[in-house]
């Protein structure tokens, strides 16, 4: 296959040839890279000290203390408005944290992550217009986190 025969994709990209096969390399930049690294670093600090096995509420309290210590701006239990056809609904979402006024952070204490919390964060992003959500799981032996971008 010639490089000219490979279909085009949206976004910045590059193709590399490996043993006669072409592989697409997406050249994406992380949004809010520095801010998200700081938030994940704060979560790692909490997990390093507490480990796994506590309730989600314990991790939320410890994470809030770590955000304060590292001077990361946040709002806890941030109420997120929901709109339907331009009208604000009475029902609102409550995100665990919104950091830097632009990153939704949802904490979990699950043995393994499943797709439910991901869908929850994507709904938060859709309703607020924010672009980045971080799903952080303290319940496993190693800290787990996912970046969700809308």
Regions from the PLM with identified roles:
Residues 68-85:
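A short acidic/basic microdomain associated with nuclease active sites
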Residues 8-15, 21:
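Short Gly/Ser/Thr- and charged-rich N-terminal loops/segments
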Residues 32-37, 52-56, 60, 64:
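Nuclease catalytic cores
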Residues 1-8:
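Extreme N-terminal basic, low-complexity initiation segments
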Residues 88-93:
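A short, glycine/Asx- and small/polar-enriched loop/turn
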Residues 51, 95-113, 124:
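Conserved catalytic cores of phosphodiester-cleaving nucleases, focusing on short active-site segments
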Residues 17-50:
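Interdomain/boundary linker segments immediately adjacent to catalytic/signaling cores
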Residues 108-150:
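Nucleic-acid nuclease catalytic cores
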């Amino acid at each position: 296959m010639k490089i000219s025969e490979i279909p085009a994709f949206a976004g910045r990209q590059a193709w590399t040839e490996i043993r006669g096969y072409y592989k697409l390399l997406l050249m994406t930049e992380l949004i809010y890279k520095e801010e998200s690294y700081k938030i994940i670093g704060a979560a790692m600090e909490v997990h390093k000290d507490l480990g796994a096995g506590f309730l989600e509420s314990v991790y939320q309290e410890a994470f809030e203390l770590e955000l304060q210590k590292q001077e990361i701006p946040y709002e806890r239990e941030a109420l997120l408005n929901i709109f339907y056809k331009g009208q604000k609904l009475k029902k609102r979402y409550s995100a665990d944290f919104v950091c830097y006024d632009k990153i939704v952070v949802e904490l979990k204490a699950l043995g393994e992550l499943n797709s439910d919390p991901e869908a929850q964060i994507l709904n938060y992003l859709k309703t607020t217009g924010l672009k980045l959500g971080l799903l952080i799981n303290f319940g496993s032996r190693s800290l787990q986190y996912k970046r969700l971008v809308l």
